[in-house]
Amino acid sequence: MIPEPLAEFDTDEWSKKDFTERVRIGTNLYVLKGLGYPLAAYLFHAVKLSLFVLGWVFFCRFTPGLGTLRDFRSWIFDGTAFQKAFLWASLVEVMGFGCMSGPLGLRMWPPFTAFLHFLRPGTTKLPLVRGLPLLGTNTRTMLDVALYAALVVSLLRALVQPAIAASHLVPIVALLPLCALGDGTIALAGRFEHHFAMIVCFLLAGNWIAACKWVQLAIWFWAGVSKLTVAFGYVVPIMTANNPLLKSAALRRRLFVSYPDDLRPSRLAKTMAHAGTFLEFAAPLTLLFVTHHGPLLYVGMSFVLLLHGFILSNLPIAAVFEWNILSIYAAFFLFAAHPTVSLFAVGSVPLTVYLVVVLLVVPLIGNLVPSKVSFLLAMRYYAGNWAWNAWLFRRGSQRKLARLKRAAPLLREQLERFLSAEQAAQMDAGFLAFRALHLQGRVLGLLLPRATDGNPFREYTYVDGEAVAASALGWNFGEGHLADERLIAAVQEQCDFEEGELRVICVEAQPILGSTLHWRIVDANRGVLEEGHAQLSDLARRKPWDCGEA
């Protein structure tokens, strides 16, 4: 169970505290205890990860000679086993059983929401082209539901085949983009930049192993590029401090410059961040030149294991365990088991054009102009440099969200089903601290008084945009563009907030060649009230709990 809350979280006492007090208490507690998830939460994800692996083994058994646990070494690097791993992962993710599910994915009950949301007519969605005939509405139609159901069935159909043929892949490759036209959230949930790209390689490549190597190398390389901003230095101590396996209070404090007064990343934390960036570049740039078994392969694989092993060992929120395990398996299959397959054996001009676009052009634009591309499509994983939003509801107006068709309410309401009001407040403080500790999150204190007419937490309730997207869209994964003006408009269409009842602070990511963050203050009824840019150097000088101009 979550430990009994501190006296500060007494319901009456907590309601009287302002932004500075809440963040100060929350950040101090976060550094020493993290978010404070109970052991049961981690056991839930351990079981889920085991079922992910066993599910893959189960579908491999449909292929003669595969899927036997006793002699798994004889088939684990079979081509069909690899294809089924990515088809299975695609099914798991597009149904919401993978990342951002369960307690570490900010879902208490129900722990899985995506498929419940995507299969229900009338739920909120974000069409890629608003107003597009048949698919461009803000609420889900029977056509949207039918397309999504067909995608799920197509993935299942491919998984139960003895061998994967083009006829099994064509429906998947056609249906996911069609689903995305109606709701771009589904494309992100299906990991369009990774799992879908691999499936396209299975379908179009003369040698799909060569093509898949390019996809996996790009995943690591662009992840490394995304770390070349000041924001990543803040990610490592925040992620590490939330590790329940890290028991040493002294080591937790050493992650920050001077706990509890200066919570910028320490020299130790920055060194860890630089090491992580090195690994994300070193892994692909080493494996790029592997042509046979030998020292270069062993060094490259060591970099992969260190990189993903560090992420997994921190038991991070967002529940990205399946994706990290899949990436490790992909490294072993593509490079250790098939080192002699040349990267230049793709053998398909259309696929080469596709790979250039999705592995080079899109990530490049996403790093240069992050407002135009999802951080997932730009492969900017774990960078801490993401768009995000703060939704501010006046005088309980969040109750209007009940007008939406949803698979789950807001996170706070879910917490209160299992915890006391004081315990729920303590968890809330942890989530607020998590946001405020990030460099981008320090915009919150800067803009909060302006967005709330000087009355933060007295008249307004703060809800992170992640929690709103999770409830309103059924899926979220750190993608701030899912909770910006498009979702505000879709929610306003159904909930009809009066002027001042819902204000949203929207913050964009830092362009890799820039030094500012673009922000907007939006009223759901009136539109954009104010916008501007915040200098990263100014944000770095702010304390997480500073409120207003510091």
Q: Could you describe each region identified by the protein language model?
A:
Residues 1-550:
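Alpha-helical membrane-anchoring segments
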